[in-house]
């Protein structure tokens, strides 16, 4: 019972911390990501914002996770080249989990090369491999 209460409190604390520190994306920032143009992206975001959790609709993403989610290869490559945190989780979700969900095997490989933790767990105890498996992304699950 004590373990359940401790786990519940920890999950609640992580969720609260993420919601306090997350910021809303501006219209200009959302449009900059959609272009997949590095110069447009750099004009909309400061380097300090690359690893912040930004709320977009009902989800929270780092710019790396968001670019992976929307298949913006130029921005993903740019962020990886500029040392974005490959293990930064927003609401428990890491960039590797996003790549796994959408079956982006090549990006998952790049994330792993950059040091992504394939054993990281979300707030429900799921790993990137679990996400790949649940979404029938067999090729991605195989590398995890």
Regions found by a protein language model. Name each.
Residues 100, 108:
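Short, solvent-exposed interaction modules
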Residues 3-7, 12-31, 35-61, 73-74, ...:
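Ankyrin repeat arrays, specifically the small/polar loop and inter-repeat linker segments at the C-terminal end
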Residues 61-70, 95-98:
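Non-membrane alpha-helical segments in proteins
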